[in-house]
């Protein structure tokens, strides 16, 4: 049972957590496993689903007036007694019956199970296409009826707006208010959106608005201080959120894991005018160093300045101001400039729009116009691209996803690809992962992986595969890793006479139209990660007869879960569909990790393209490179969390806020 008294706390949230010892972490893992087995095992979930269906049957014959009275009685009971199982089952019955009448959709038993798992505070792993948007209405509406503010957190604004628009009629019929909050809204619009019972928003918008509340309130963000402000009629209107009560995180592995590598920072223009000149000098110095002699590059590691490079820099800085005479400071600045030059590429990590450098989210493939890199990296990339340089920023507040989501009174989530990171999610967020079987067996056909030595060979094979499907009338979705790769492949398709659409961060305003047409007969769509998580491509009966949607992956990402999300765009809810990988040993992953081994295997595969051992060893190397990249990101997340804990401990000692 979940019953928290929120009265007297104007901004309810969990207190900050201290880092646990390894023994405490092991104990917590054991406790989570036992609670998961006890609360959400198959027998419990099966009985719950049957009781919900029975409760719905009892209410189907009620008049509208009697049904409203029953819902009012249930609402009062939920607010008085909390989320007791008997009350939850009745609430689920109301939600299912209302969805059936208002939306024309009734929750399947597997969706009832997924909703219950989330309401109990777990992460439900449901296959792509199983209807997670509708499933989320069960815990969201039930918690809202019980008096809690619910945040339904998604990975992008397109999904937040779409899901809210689809489900608002259901919530309205239940007497629950809904709101959508996007980054482009002003403070008044956001405040109004956050006042709703169920709020749809993105993870970044939610975190940044929380940080803005902290900046606004400072040390007054404490129950006693805020209660006093509310008593005297002040303070409450200053904040946007109503606290951190209950969050349902969609695509939870993306938000909890993939996006958790960098902290969320609110900054303001720096008052130090000399900092911009300092960065220009750093860039100028970096251009006078020679790769291989003065600095080295290795995979995803930052550029490393050699002893010769250190001596060269010391010589170049002899006549520069005193700030350049310290070895550590100058080498750190020049290394950052080299990072901007070599590690960040246009149309991969950022785009140029309206003479501005705009960050592209690696995970979602979307432009983040209001985001910027820290520690001068944004300005150095702007210098590199020759666009207007924005003033450097100073940090006002920062927090990591790991620390932020642990502050919710209750946290839950759902995803189709979280089993690989279940241990990390349990350790960091205290969330157990519960697998939910699909409603219908998958009809997806997994075609053999095609591996080529060179990217040009792989692209030619992609063109041939797409042409075959196009002639059969089968729609094709081709996934690429970057904007540049999507545009290069588009050029190959145009030369081959294949009509197609391209969806990447440069065409983000046409997203709805492109997605709507991606399932048309004979349609060809090239897309980055924007067509990954949450994208539902509708198919006609005619297209299903042609074999359904065919998905081609042209390059693997840094973790296998992103690839699986793309595969999940086809064969949804029992529809037919197929999936294929056409890769090369020239792909980005193979360029970063043990490149000498990659070149050797590439030369061997080029000489003997049909030799089984050459292809097999090539795929072993490719999988290893992907695994190595994933482990590297995991190390970064652990280090960020460790730093976050250390910062919090030091600030709590000094009395400052993080």
From Swiss-Prot:
GO terms for biological process: intracellular protein transmembrane transport; protein import; protein targeting; protein transport by the Sec complex. Keywords: ATP-binding, Cell inner membrane, Cell membrane, Cytoplasm, Membrane, Nucleotide-binding, Protein transport, Translocase, Translocation, Transport. It comes from the Bacteria. Monomer and homodimer. Part of the essential Sec protein translocation apparatus which comprises SecA, SecYEG and auxiliary proteins SecDF-YajC and YidC. It holds the Pfam family SecA_PP_bind. The keyword Translocase applies. It comes from Magnetococcus marinus (strain ATCC BAA-1437 / JCM 17883 / MC-1). Its main location: membrane. It catalyses: ATP + H2O + cellular proteinSide 1 = ADP + phosphate + cellular proteinSide 2. Belongs to the SecA family. GO terms for molecular function: ATP binding; protein-exporting ATPase activity. ATP binds at residues 111, 129-133, 536. GO terms for cellular component: cell envelope Sec protein transport complex; cytosol; plasma membrane. PANTHER family: CHLOROPLAST PROTEIN-TRANSPORTING ATPASE (PTHR30612:SF0), SECA INNER MEMBRANE COMPONENT OF SEC PROTEIN SECRETION SYSTEM (PTHR30612). Its EC number is 7.4.2.8. This is Protein translocase subunit SecA 3. Part of the Sec protein translocase complex. Interacts with the SecYEG preprotein conducting channel. Has a central role in coupling the hydrolysis of ATP to the transfer of proteins into and across the cell membrane, serving both as a receptor for the preprotein-SecB complex and as an ATP-driven molecular motor driving the stepwise translocation of polypeptide chains across the membrane. It is found in: Cell inner membrane; Cytoplasm.
């Amino acid at each position: 049972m979940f019953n928290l008294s929120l009265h007297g706390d104007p901004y309810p949230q969990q207190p900050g957590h201290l880092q646990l010892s390894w023994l405490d972490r092991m104990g917590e893992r054991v406790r989570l496993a036992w609670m998961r087995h006890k609360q959400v095992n198959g027998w419990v979930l099966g009985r719950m689903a049957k009781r919900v269906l029975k409760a719905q049957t009892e209410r189907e014959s009620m008049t509208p007036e009697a049904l409203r009275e029953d819902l009012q009685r249930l609402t009062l009971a939920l607010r008085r007694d909390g989320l007791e199982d008997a009350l939850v089952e009745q609430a689920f019955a109301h939600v299912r019956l209302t969805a059936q009448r208002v939306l024309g959709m009734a929750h399947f038993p597997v969706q009832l199970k997924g909703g219950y798992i989330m309401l109990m505070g777990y992460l439900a792993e449901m296959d792509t296409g199983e209807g997670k948007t509708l499933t989320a209405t069960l815990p969201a509406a039930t918690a809202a009826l019980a008096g809690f503010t619910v945040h339904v957190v998604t990975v992008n604004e397109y999904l937040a707006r779409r899901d809210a628009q689809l489900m608002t009629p259901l919530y309205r019929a239940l007497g629950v208010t809904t709101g959508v909050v996007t980054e482009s809204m002003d403070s008044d619009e956001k405040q109004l959106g956050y006042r709703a019972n169920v709020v749809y928003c993105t993870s970044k918008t939610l975190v940044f608005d929380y940080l803005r509340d902290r900046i606004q309130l400072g040390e007054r963000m404490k129950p006693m201080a805020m209660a006093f402000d509310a008593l005297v009629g002040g303070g409450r209107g200053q904040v946007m959120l109503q606290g951190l009560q209950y969050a349902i995180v969609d695509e939870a592995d993306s938000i909890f894991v993939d996006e958790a590598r960098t902290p969320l920072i609110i900054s303001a223009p720096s008052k130090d005018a000399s900092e911009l000149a300092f960065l220009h000098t750093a860039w100028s110095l970096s251009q006078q160093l020679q790769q291989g002699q003065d600095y080295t590059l290795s995979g995803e590691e930052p550029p490393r300045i050699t002893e010769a490079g250190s001596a060269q820099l010391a010589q170049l800085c002899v006549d520069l101001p005193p700030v350049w005479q310290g070895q550590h400071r100058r080498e750190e600045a020049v290394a950052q400039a080299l990072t901007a030059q070599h590690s960040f590429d246009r149309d991969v990590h950022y785009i140029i729009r309206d003479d501005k450098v705009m960050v592209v989210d690696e995970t979602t493939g979307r432009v983040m116009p209001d985001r910027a890199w820290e520690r001068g990296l944004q300005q150095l990339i702007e210098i590199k691209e020759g666009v207007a340089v924005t003033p450097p920023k100073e940090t006002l507040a920062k927090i990591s996803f790991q620390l932020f989501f642990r502050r919710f009174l209750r946290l839950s989530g759902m995803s189709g690809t979280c089993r690989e990171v279940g241990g990390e999610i349990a350790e960091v967020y205290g969330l157990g992962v519960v697998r939910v079987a699909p409603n219908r067996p998958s009809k997806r056909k997994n075609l053999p992986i095609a591996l080529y030595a060179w990217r040009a060979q792989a692209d030619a094979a992609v063109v041939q595969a797409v042409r075959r499907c196009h002639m059969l009338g089968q729609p094709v979705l081709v996934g690429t890793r970057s904007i540049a790769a999507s545009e290069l492949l588009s050029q190959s398709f145009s030369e081959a006479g294949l009509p197609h659409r391209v969806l990447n961060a440069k065409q983000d305003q046409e997203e709805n139209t492109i997605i709507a047409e991606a399932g048309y007969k004979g349609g060809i769509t090239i897309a980055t990660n924007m067509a990954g998580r949450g994208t539902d491509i509708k198919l006609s009966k005619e297209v299903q007869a042609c074999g359904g949607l065919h998905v081609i992956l042209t390059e693997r990402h840094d973790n296998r879960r992103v690839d699986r999300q793309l595969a999940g765009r086809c064969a949804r809810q029992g529809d037919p569909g197929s999936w294929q990988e056409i890769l090369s040993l020239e792909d980005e992953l193979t360029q970063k990790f043990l490149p000498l081994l990659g070149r050797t295997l590439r030369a061997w595969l080029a000489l003997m393209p049909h030799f089984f051992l050459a292809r097999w060893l090539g795929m072993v190397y490719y999988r290893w490179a992907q695994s190595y990249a994933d482990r590297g990101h995991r190390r970064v997340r652990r280090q960020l969390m460790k730093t976050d804990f250390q910062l919090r401990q030091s600030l709590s000692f000094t009395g400052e806020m993080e």
